[in-house]
């Protein structure tokens, strides 16, 4: 497998500088193996790389929907009985495939690549292989402090009773957090009040008896 990829990469590198050497590398690998179509994008007959200048590509489409076939489809949908000839025409229409024709300009041989039939595509549309539930992305679960405390207590069941007794419950943890937040806000408020009083004292000095006499 590694040798195959190495030879294919070397052939694509040599297709402009030495196309004969590129064809020889592909032919040497294909001749030593039973499967002739081992390389994609190459001619299975002469091992020529099917690039734009050395190949011709055509598409043979599926047969179009005619009024006769549409009438047969409507009769089949209504569960009407069809004759052998009509059923054969309808089966041929459903099993029809698009064909990609690639002609190699070196050996003038054509390679056919068949597509999927109408019946397969209709079945694929009606019964998708990948359900929509798998395609939906899962939202990550957010852990709250209460859930973390519950997980901690559940994980500490196998420990000693002293450790289990010391683990606070969710209500106690919330009350402790609220008391800590209240003390922090009171401390910040007192500091702000002290700063404001200092600034006011700097702007308005104390009116003692000496200042009062000097103002007169």
Curated annotation (Swiss-Prot):
InterPro entries: DUF4674 (IPR029779). It comes from the Eukaryota. Residues 118-185, 197-216 are annotated as: Disordered. Residues 200-209 have a biased composition (Basic and acidic residues). Residues 124-136, 145-157, 167-182 have a biased composition (Polar residues). The keyword Phosphoprotein applies. Pfam families: DUF4674. Signal peptide: none annotated. The modification Phosphothreonine is found at residues 130, 139. The modification Phosphoserine is found at residue 126. Keywords: Phosphoprotein. Belongs to the UPF0711 family. This is UPF0711 protein C18orf21 homolog. It comes from Bos taurus (Bovine). The lineage of its organism: Eukaryota, Metazoa, Chordata, Craniata, Vertebrata.
């Amino acid at each position: 497998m590694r040798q195959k990829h190495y030879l294919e990469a070397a052939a694509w590198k040599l297709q402009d500088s030495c196309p004969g050497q590129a064809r020889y590398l592909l032919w040497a690998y294909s001749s030593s193996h039973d499967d002739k179509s081992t390389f994609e994008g190459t001619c299975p007959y002469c091992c020529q790389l099917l690039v734009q200048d050395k190949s011709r590509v055509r598409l043979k489409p599926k047969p179009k929907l005619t009024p006769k076939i549409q009438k047969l489809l409507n009769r089949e949908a209504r569960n009407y009985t069809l004759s052998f000839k009509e059923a054969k025409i309808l089966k041929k229409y459903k099993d029809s495939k698009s064909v990609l024709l690639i002609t190699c300009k070196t050996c003038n041989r054509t390679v056919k690549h068949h597509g999927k039939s109408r019946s397969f595509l209709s079945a694929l549309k009606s019964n998708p292989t990948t359900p929509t539930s798998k395609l939906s992305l899962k939202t990550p679960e957010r852990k709250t402090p209460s859930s973390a405390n519950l997980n901690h207590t559940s994980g500490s069941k196998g420990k000693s009773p002293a450790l289990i007794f010391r683990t606070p419950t969710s209500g106690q943890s919330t009350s402790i957090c609220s008391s800590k937040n209240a003390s922090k806000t009171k401390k910040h408020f007192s500091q702000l009040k002290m700063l404001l009083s200092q600034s006011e004292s700097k702007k308005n000095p104390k009116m003692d008896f000496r200042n009062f006499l000097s103002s007169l």
